[in-house]
Amino acid sequence: MNLTKKIWCTIFALIVLLPYLHADTIKMMQYNMMYYTTAVPSGCTVTSSYLNDKDINLKKIIKYVQPDIFSVNEIGSQSTYVDRIKNNVLNTDGVTYYQNCPLTNFSGGSIANMVYYDSRKLGFHSFFYITTTVRDINAYKMYYKTPQLLSGDTIFITFIVTHLKAGSYDSDQTTRAQQTAALMTKLQQIGVADNYVFSGDFNLYSSSETAYQNLINYSNTLYRFYDPINQPGNWNNASQFANIHTQSTHTSSSGGCFSTGGMDDRFDFILVSPYIYFGSKKVKSVNESYHALGQDGNRYNGEINNPANTSIPDSIANALYNFSDHLPVILEFAIDNTVSIADFEEPFLVQVYNPIENMLTIEFQLNEADQYTLEVYSMDGKRLLMHKNYFETGNSVFKLPFELPASLYIIKIQNSKKQTVVKKAIKF
């Protein structure tokens, strides 16, 4: 191997492996806990052991998943319920490291949102909330406890939790749209496009709903949210989405508390900002990790534990069935804590998709319009393709004919200021 090839192989190895050599992973679980309160609505009949039974089932789920971030809906809006989960479920059997964020309930009501976190990995920084006609939208800014923390260098992630208005009437859809519009306006007012995670029970029936479009097609592309599994459609009662439905775990309900009808809705979501989706500020969503716990694709209009679940143990399937009519949604995040943030922050957002049918697709998120030069290199350092193109501010998708053999390639993208982003592409 000549010197040039050795150099390029070394560069390629650094590009591909360096951000992950010492990467940590944060596992998030989002869960609508279904009335974790004694203030249940009329028609829901509970026994004196109601919360004790819920604690037993939730503890099984927590021990099985072991989340670092646990965001919840439908927790009682008093601190006693927040403390109860922390003390009776999370910090048990020798575990002492779970903490909770501040509770708010300025919108009023008997249920609220909450975020619990593993204090060995994360610390609480600050929070804000948005009042709505239904429930607060809660945002908690967390910092990752990097080895460089004492020198003031860390990674921030803001976890935003909501429980949007339920119902299928036009008025319900309008309220949901108002809620998500309020969030996007708030983020724009803050003025920092950053690492945001937005999760909760969205109560959406379709990706065409205005509430959802407010998130994924917001006018300022730097604040848009991305669905890690990119599954748009009419989710309600559609068998083609059976593997992502999150509600209901029950087909019938003897006590009147659980929604019925079986698994036929995608109500529960974890969405991420472009900075997390593209991994540009040291945090990247591991999109293939996204799943609803217990959703093996065989639950359409059925129950989570009958017939036997193929993705989780029977004990966990039964705990999910007994605890809530929703399934928890799980997503992992890769944290690059190798060097200081400034060293590896990319000057502009780029996502390179592996070539399909001799076409290379590149997606840009740009703060300013400019001319960009795209170059494709082989592993031995030979430039194979070069193309120049002018892109406007915002989101752009560029497709380049890619009639090259199956191999690994290095993609170099540079603007007129000589700011450069280097990616890899694999053609199979």
Residues of each region from the PLM?
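Exposed aromatic-hydrophobic patches
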Residues: S396-F402
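Residue-level detector of functionally pivotal "anchor" positions at catalytic/ligand-binding pockets or at interdomain
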Residues: I335-I356, Q365-N367, K382-L384
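Short, glycine-anchored, charge-dense loop/turn motifs used at functional sites
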Residues: V376-L384, Y409
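Non-cytosolic beta-sheet module surface loops
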Residues: E74, V82, T131, N354, ...
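Short beta-strand/loop motifs in extracellular/secreted proteins, especially
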Residues: D194, D370-T373, Y409
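C-terminal tail/sorting-segment detector
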Residues: F391-T393, L404-F428
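Divalent cation-coordinating acidic motifs and surrounding scaffolds
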Residues: D24-N337
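Bacterial Sec-dependent N-terminal signal peptides
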Residues: M1-T25
